[in-house]
Amino acid sequence: MTVARHSFARYGYHGTSVDSIVKEANLSKGALYWHFKTKMDLYRAVLEAEVDKIKAFFAPTEEDMCCKPIDYLIDKGGEFFGCIAVDEEGIMLWMNLWMEARRGNEQISKMAQELSESLMQDMIDMVKMAFPAVSSGAGRLSPKELALTLSSCFEGISKNVGLRCDVDQAKRSWRFVVERLIEGGRSYAA
């Protein structure tokens, strides 16, 4: 899986061959196909493992439950940007997945949607739990809309770590986004 993860991250789905994976992993094709029927199944398994890592990373512990939800969201997001700086293959996997989906590959597009929905549902549940007023309709956005807005901003910042911003700038940007979305603030235009 490590070799497949590396190849899919660096070369994308179409740029990665089963031959290159088995050669690098020192496996036979038969051994690979024993576990995965197709290259697409292997790709899905790699991405599902990424989803599981992300969910585990953001799952609050009992200690986290003592924090203010906004602080938890800001701190965990910032910590994740540090992870991206160390392991950029994770973000590269997602960027390749989104690009392939945008290019119209229906199978990959469907998979991208399913994986994103899985992450989104966890985010919606977290928003409902952390910010009960949103669930009761107190805000302008529904829990799903708030989760989508937060995750879209988070993904945008994530894609820029190491390219257009460093980890500290990413953390500052994330703090700004979360505080503005959750707490509001005075207008910059005023």
Name these PLM-found stretches.
Residues 3-41, 45-46:
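Helix-turn-helix
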Residues 5, 9, 44, 48, ...:
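Solvent-exposed, non-membrane alpha-helical residues enriched in polar/charged side chains
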Residues 59, 67, 71, 86-89, ...:
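Amphipathic alpha-helical packing segments from all-alpha helical-bundle domains
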Residues 83-86, 100-103, 125, 129, ...:
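Amphipathic C-terminal alpha-helical segment
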